[in-house]
Amino acid sequence: MEFPKELSKTSTFRDIIDNNCVYVDKTDLIAKFAYLKGPFVFFRPRGFGKSTLISSLQDLFEMGLDNFHSLKIGRLWKDKTYKVIKLDFSSFKESSSTEDFKASFNRELFTALKNANLSLNKVQENDGPSDLLSEILMNIDSTDLVLLIDNYDAPLTAVLADKTEFTSRQKILSNFYSTVKSYQGVFRFVFITGEINYFSSSTFSSFNLSEDLSLNSDFGALAGFTEDELECYFSPYIDRACKILNKLNKSNKYTHDNLLSTLKRKYGDYCFDNKCKEHVYNPSFIVHFFSELKEEHPNSHISESFRNSSLDNFLRHVLSKDIKEQLLKCIDLGISIDLAQSNLYPQLDMLTERNLYAILYQLGNLCIKASRKGILSLGIPNLEVKQALKELVKDV
C-alpha cells in the first residue's frame, strides 16, 4: 500500500514539510493567538507536539508564509518577518552543578542570539544569561524580535528533589525572565512551552502576567490529535493496520471503525481544557504505533516514556504507604479525583503529597473527565497510561 505522505521522525517543521511528511495542520489555531503579542505560556505533557508547535512558530515568524501557503493559516496571516530567538531549555537540564548550569545556559543563549543574526560585537559569551540578554536588547528600539522557549521547565524538573540546586537554578531563571519583562517592548511575540507550571511560584512573580493558554477551550486541540484529524491525516495507515492485525490474528476482527475505537481506548481520550470540549490522542504514541506496526505487533514504549520522565523520581519522594494505596485504588477502580481548577497548577517550590494529583495531571497521567463550577474531575485517560502508571506506582 502506498502512502501519499510519510510519517515524520522529526519535530522540525521545515523538515516535515520539505520531506512531504504528515503534518497535522493546526495553523488556524496558531493564527488565533500569534497575531497578539503575549507573552503566552502553554503546558502539555511530553510527546504532545510542543516542539513541533514551537518550530512552526519559528518558521512562520522568520520566513512568513513561504512554507505555509497550502496550510490553513495561508489565507489568514498578514504579518511581516522577524528575527527569532529560539531556546530549548532541555538541552542543558543535566548540568552537574549550578556553575555548569549557568555556563550551559550561556552557551545556549549565545548560540540562539547568533542564529537570530543579532549583533554580538559588544557581548561576551561568559556574561551571565540575564546580562547577555540585556546587552543585546538594550540596543533594539522597535518590536523586531520574537522569543520562543521550548521545555522551559526542564532544568527545574531535573532537580526537583534537590532543593539547593532547584533554588539556585530558579534564581538564575527568574533573573532571566525579569530581563525579558524589562524589555518586553522590543518583543513582537513571546511564547513558552513546558510540562510543569513553575510560573505560579512566587520566585517567578516577575513573569506572572503571561497569558496561560493551557486550559483555554479554544486551544484544547492545539497539541494532540483529535479523532477527526486522525481520520483526515492517517486514514491510509489505519486501513493498513487493520490488514496487518487481521493477518497476525488470523481473523477479520479489525475494521476501520473498531480500530479507531481501540486506538482511543489505548492512546486517546486526553482532555486538557476546562470545558471538556476537546479530546485528543497522544501524537507520539499514535506515530509510534503506525511506524512500528509492520508484520508484527509494535513494541510498547509507554513504560519507557514514563521512566524517562520526572515521574519516577517524584513518586519516590512523595508517596507514603497510605497515598500509594489510595492512588492504586483510583487506578484500579477508575475513581475520579476532584480538584479545584485553581489547584491544578499550584505553587511548586518543593515536592509534597499536596501537589501529587496536580503533578500527575501536568505530566499526562491524569486528564480532565468533567468540569462543573470551577471543579475539575481528573481520571486516567486510557489503558496504556493506566497500565504504565500502575506498574510505576507498585515499583516505587
Where do the language-model regions lie?
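Extended alpha-helical interface modules used as scaffolds for assembling large macromolecular complexes
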Residues: Y281-V396
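P-loop NTPase motor core
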Residues: K9, D66-K114
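Walker A/P-loop-proximal flanking segment of P-loop NTPase domains
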Residues: M1-F48, T52-F61, L65-L71
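Amphipathic alpha-helical segments of the small helical/lid subdomains adjacent to P-loop NTPase cores
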Residues: S202-S206, L213-S291
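Short glycine-rich substrate-engagement loop in P-loop NTPases that contacts/grips substrate
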Residues: E99-D100, L118-I136
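Substrate-engagement module of ASCE P-loop NTPases
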Residues: E135-M138, T167-R188
